């Protein structure tokens, strides 16, 4: 399965034996809540990879965003991770990826990187009652994003 992330494990030969192992996580591409195609991934699969190691991690993000619910789950997983999490924006952390970026103990951006934050959006179909529900849902998502 193609994933929108990949891990780079530390090179044991080059590692200082007194320093803790550091893993690197690359978040690249669209963040998805459910797997609709082979190139999508669920937060559950992400969690399995996250907890398979320990120690500090560096998260490199280059993502246009994706599903805000999946991003919130990944944000929570990184916030609960027991080691230090350093986030580095490599290119772009847009939309839902900006939420994931806020989970870092430290967040670093180069002068040529971009973070794009916007109000949540959706497509809604239905009568006026359904439209009110959609507006309420968007307002709730906006508040949760602001809290990150």
Residue ranges and their predicted role:
Residues 1-148:
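Terminal-region recognition feature
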């Amino acid at each position: 399965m193609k994933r929108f992330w990949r891990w780079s494990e530390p090179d044991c030969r080059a590692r200082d034996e007194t320093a803790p192992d550091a893993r690197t996580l690359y978040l690249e591409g669209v963040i998805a809540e459910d797997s609709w195609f082979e190139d999508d991934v669920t937060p559950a699969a992400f969690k399995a990879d996250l907890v398979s190691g320990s120690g500090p991690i560096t998260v490199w993000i280059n993502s246009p965003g994706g599903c805000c619910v999946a991003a919130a789950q990944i944000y929570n997983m990184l916030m609960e991770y027991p080691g230090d999490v350093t986030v580095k924006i490599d290119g772009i952390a847009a939309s839902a990826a900006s939420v994931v970026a806020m989970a870092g103990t430290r967040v670093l951006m180069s002068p040529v990187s971009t973070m794009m934050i916007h109000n949540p959006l959706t497509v809604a179909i239905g009568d006026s009652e359904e439209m009110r529900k959609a507006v309420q849902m968007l307002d709730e998502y906006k508040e949760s994003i602001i809290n990150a």
